[in-house]
Amino acid sequence: MSNILEVKNVFKQYGDYTALNKVSLSVPQGSIYGLLGPNGAGKTSLIRIINQITMPDSGEIILDGAVLKPEDVQYIGYMPEERGLYKSMKVGEQCLYLAQLKGLSKHDAKTQLDYWFDRLEIQGWWNKKIQELSKGMAQKIQFVVTVLHKPKLLILDEPFSGFDPVNANLIKDEIIELNKQGTSVIFSTHRMESVEEMCDHIALIHKSNKLIEGKLTDVKKQFRTNSYEVGILSDNIEGLMYDLSQKFTLTQTDFKSLNDELKLEINLGNATPNELLNTLILRGQVTHFMEKIPSVNDIFIKTVTE
């Protein structure tokens, strides 16, 4: 698979502070790529360099196979965490202006705006001023001006900030639909549940360094702990616990009195899943048996606290 974006050994320093320490990333064409990290990790510095707001001290950015050039701004859609709409301008006037900055003719801009205003059901906002809109309403306008020029690469920094759950879900669906149509997406957020739902690749930056990068499924495999979540109905709990203790490590126990189901989290150690399952079957009725796959949140916390 080719890459829509390659970041090669990017180094950025502000005075004595190193914001990015020779960071390299590869964003596959057509992916939704989660850029993760705690506050101050270097994510925003990297995003600003990709958008040519600031320049790296060394290293280079490759967009769609060629070194990034100033005119490539037309191929990128960027929605920063700090939204940047002019509060005193009318919505329609501002959208037309920003669209033309991205290279669209006035006619094409109006066509795209009509499409998006209709799609998001905001037709009545055209003559309103930004200052008359709620934060969530202004967020919708910011999203529209970010995507209306049909960018190859969409960079979204905390895109769900300010949205209620209904509108957050609406924007999420629009991002997924744009991706299905071929737009590659870089998605920076602290909402780990959104990363789980949407991203197929992730990278984690911490203290100016890239610590993790890869397909989400592969990264999760790297962090597996060989633990299983099981549920069992047994009339001999004491015998079951003894049998399990001979070969496995119990890391969590939860007894559900409603149906007398015992829920366990068990680390296999050097044993196999079949050995665990056979041990359980001998002592009761197995109701649940599943490997515990780490969540993105688990991986994030483990990586930044080690």
Cite the ranges covered by each PLM segment.
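Short, Lys/Arg-enriched, disordered terminal segments
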Residues: M1-L5, T305-E306
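C-terminal coupling/interaction segments
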Residues: E265-E306
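Conserved protein kinase catalytic domain
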Residues: I76-G77, F117, K220, N297-I301
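ABC transporter nucleotide-binding domains
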Residues: I4-L5, K12-H206, I212
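A generic structural signal for secondary-structure junctions
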Residues: D64, Q94, G103, Q142, ...
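ABC transporter nucleotide-binding domain
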Residues: D173-N267
